[in-house]
A protein has these predicted regions:
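Conserved helicase motor core of SF1/SF2 NTP-dependent helicases
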Residues: 1-340
Length: 341
């Protein structure tokens, strides 16, 4: 049971052994080796999922509560102590060498069109020059609410770019389609000679050699469940992962660089039990406030784009008075305590 792959707003409690197996006698077997995801991707996914290298005084937004789990999943202490409230440095063994030096590629774009054009050209290069199979590529769109319109826009750019390219084929076969896996097509995830395009909720439990994570700006960098989405998406990859920001608003690039500069080791101060409780509480309140902020920002952008006057009444209609008050209080606290963010 993986706490960091919980994708809903409310985390379910980790079930006990008795809740799963009853009173039957059983033996614990720790699976310390990960044969799917390379060390570089897995450690970076943990760092991003927990917020370990965020550039703030209190970076942690999520944490594995049972400290014994770290050793169970293959990490070992190389410095400090693995206990609540202490400094610790965790490393893990490289099970097999990665064939490329940079398996995590982050890119920012000014808009989604540039993002989709980049993905199209990367896929073209991978299939034509690297002999990658189309069905070894997985596209995960973190903007799950807009997957229908996003996938249509991507397919239009993809097919328009490649329609005149008579050399674009895969082992003698033409690339058949972009296979959108959503509510209308929930089961046919992997089709021969097709690229799957899906949400993180459909991608969970699946894997691919190469994973493109689109629209990572659609999730909050503060919210623990959002970072769980990013962690889960990254760990679908067996070889190479692309993390793409469609409007240049995230700071994941700096966090990824810190992991690499630290030789893919996790180095942080483990939260105290009291801090762990506060992290859980803050996570729930942030979800409500951040959703209100997202709604307000979208309303503002829409008004500006259409040259309309943005009035307070519009915000009240979109978010509700209670959420406006909470949003203002939240922003005031951030202004008063900048060193905590």
């Amino acid at each position: 049971y993986d706490e960091m792959q919980t994708l809903g707003d409310n985390k379910a409690p980790v079930p006990t052994k008795n809740e799963i197996f009853g009173n039957r006698e059983c033996e614990d077997i720790d699976l310390k080796r990960c044969y799917r995801t390379p060390k570089e991707i897995l450690v970076t996914a943990h760092a991003l999922g927990l917020g370990i290298y965020r550039d703030v005084r209190k970076p942690i937004v999520n944490m594995i509560e049972d400290i014994k789990v770290w050793e169970s999943i293959g990490y070992e202490v190389v410095d400090g102590e693995l206990k609540y409230g202490s400094y610790v440095k965790l490393d893990r063994k490289q099970i097999y060498p990665n064939l490329i030096s940079d398996p995590i590629r982050f890119q920012k774009f000014a808009n989604s069109t540039q993002q989709y054009e980049y993905v199209t050209n990367e896929i073209k290069q991978l299939i034509e020059n690297e002999e990658v199979l189309a069905d070894d590529i997985l596209i995960i769109d973190l903007d799950d609410k807009n997957i229908k319109s996003n996938s249509m826009k991507f397919k239009e750019i993809f097919y328009t770019t490649l329609e005149d390219n008579t050399n674009f084929f895969n082992n003698g076969q033409w690339l058949k389609t972009i296979n959108v896996v959503d509510k209308g097509n929930p089961k046919l995830f992997k089709l021969e000679n097709s690229i799957a395009y899906t949400t993180i909720y459909r991608a969970k439990g699946n894997e691919a050699n190469i994973v493109f994570i689109l629209n990572c700006d659609a999730i909050s960098s503060l919210e623990s469940t959002s970072r769980n989405c990013l962690f889960t998406a990254m760990t679908r990859s067996k070889f190479l992962v692309y993390i793409l920001d469609s409007n240049g608003t995230t700071n994941y690039e700096e966090e990824i660089k810190k992991v690499k500069d630290n030789n893919y080791v996790l180095e942080f101060n483990y939260p105290t039990k009291g801090e762990l409780k506060k992290i859980r509480t803050n996570s729930k309140s942030e979800i409500t406030v951040i959703k209100s902020m997202d709604t307000a920002i979208k309303s503002f952008r829409n008004a500006v784009e259409h040259n309309k006057k943005l009035e307070l009444e519009l915000l009240l209609q979109q978010t509700g008075k209670d959420n406006i008050d909470e949003l203002l209080q939240y922003l005031k606290e951030m202004k008063d305590k900048p060193d905590e963010w």
